[in-house]
């Protein structure tokens, strides 16, 4: 068993190159990558280089060329990491590279063919095979699946895959995702089914580089909890967490555009990722997706550069969701493997060089892994406590009564339940049967438990029947009761007993079903494979690990020998003649000059890379500025200022996520109850408040109108028409003109008041005539009449 903690452990980096595709061969692209598997070196040749320019060489922990197999990568590189996870360490495997270089193939592969299965299915098989071969250990395996699409975290196993999840941080457990679903799995088939469900909702699309390109970062999380009894007699729980990461492709946006041939896009949440069946439909989404992908990968590169430099005190984990989730895997409590996937074609030179530099920086990261022993929030401990509680209830009901333990025919001692497993006679019998059988011909727990329950139920029924017979005999012997009363009491006793038995049986069956369901979730090894085959498989695994370790040591020794040869060549200072000294020093000078030129070329490439990254960032910044200006324009022209102020007052900065959010309309601490809606009044079509009822009773205009438009009377009053003839002298008289205007205004106001009274009257009120009022025309005629009479006289 590995040590519980190590001072530091370097991040393991391996490189893998795919073969040339048919499309690249047809286009005439040449191969620019050379993989030295023995030395662990990758040599990259610039197709546009000057005649004297040397190729660039990078050294990694392991290198796999185009002829390598999936099993080679897993056995030599990933298998030791999975063994560490089963011992309680955190582990991470992630693939990084350009789109179309084989990241998804490396991580998942082809599920149907065993030889082409990738890291994830091989890890499934490895975990459950180890559990089946373990002894005196109890396991609980659960799986989660998420993706990061355009900087939004989505649960691929949720019924609402488009729902956005939040990142939280706990001082004890670290970074976690709130409301992330998790499924307990019992075998390889179940965990494969969980992953297939998640793959159906993952965001993929067609680009120039790949017809089925991953447009999101996907992380499959496996949590393995193990319970084992220690030397102190107590159960100790270890929790190992495995992150299997399939990153989206890193490439420039002009190469990540939509495929003009038209490729289907299948984003999660059923279309939020854009892109229908044509390339034009996806044209608006692909640049946006590529921008978000490059931003997150750029943040990942900044984190790796800060960790590798050992000079920066601040590590920018919070720059993206991806780096927050991988915080433990990069410089924290985890063992991490990075698989750098490369494209060999000449048109991928820039991307391959960027990937190699990225991987070369990652080699310098130091992690501090430790065993996660006895954490507080383990699901396995909750399962054990729940099983113990159900077992106690069943024993209290007499369904799991104590039985003598079986002894083997060979005189062995009684076999107890496995450590950490709640003792029960069913489990005792199960384990004893397997100990008696050398061939491990086990019986499944389900029939044993069912037979035990049936037998104990029969005993319980027999006891109740005997009790009933005793009560019947007591009633029969009671001479103070008449025969009718005795018969009535006997019938009541039988009915009560039958009812109690039925209720007891239902409750017991429910408890037993829950007990069996909880028990079946826990995995105990040593049952599924024969001992002889078990030992052979263990020996094969040990031999395979020894071979992989020997290859790794051989590769390291060869690298050290090359360095020492260079050092010894420099230290040799004895020459037989001046000619020999000139030749040796000339050769050394040429070699140093070539190194100088390589360093200058590297500096120039770094400068060009810096300019390219800066241009990409400026382009992304300009795009965000355009979007921001558009939103400001919409806000200024279409949203009222008061609504804008309300929105601005609700905004606050969430320091944990570094995002602006809205405060709730109702504070969480205020227990405010909503007002009840007015109940419907008798005879009215709608609910009416008390104020409206009083207003209607007073005859005034009610606040809430309850009348039906069908009950309103039609306005059939004839229009008021005035025909007035004025002489030429009257038309010239200003008082006559004023009189005409007042009469027209009076007619208009009279019609308006009549229509208002009719429309405001409810269907339950009788028609009322408007009160007579003094009109402007009458006042005017009254004021004019004395003057007119005087003039006439």
Curated annotation (Swiss-Prot):
Residues 10-365 form the Kinesin motor domain. One of its GO terms (cellular component) is cytoplasm. One of its GO terms (biological process) is mitotic cell cycle. InterPro entries: Kinesin-like_fam, Kinesin_motor_CS, Kinesin_motor_dom, Kinesin_motor_dom_sf, P-loop_NTPase. It is found in: Cytoplasm, Cytoskeleton. It comes from the Eukaryota. SMART domains: KISc. Residues 270-284 have a biased composition (Gly residues). Residues 631-793 are annotated as: Globular. Keywords: ATP-binding, Coiled coil, Cytoplasm, Cytoskeleton, Microtubule, Motor protein, Nucleotide-binding. Residues 376-630 form a coiled coil. Residues 399-413 have a biased composition (Basic residues). Pfam families: Kinesin (PF00225). ATP binds at residues 97-104. Residues 251-288, 395-423, 756-793 are annotated as: Disordered. Microtubule-based anterograde translocator for membranous organelles. This is Kinesin-like protein KIF3C. It comes from Pongo abelii (Sumatran orangutan). The lineage of its organism: Eukaryota, Metazoa, Chordata, Craniata, Vertebrata.
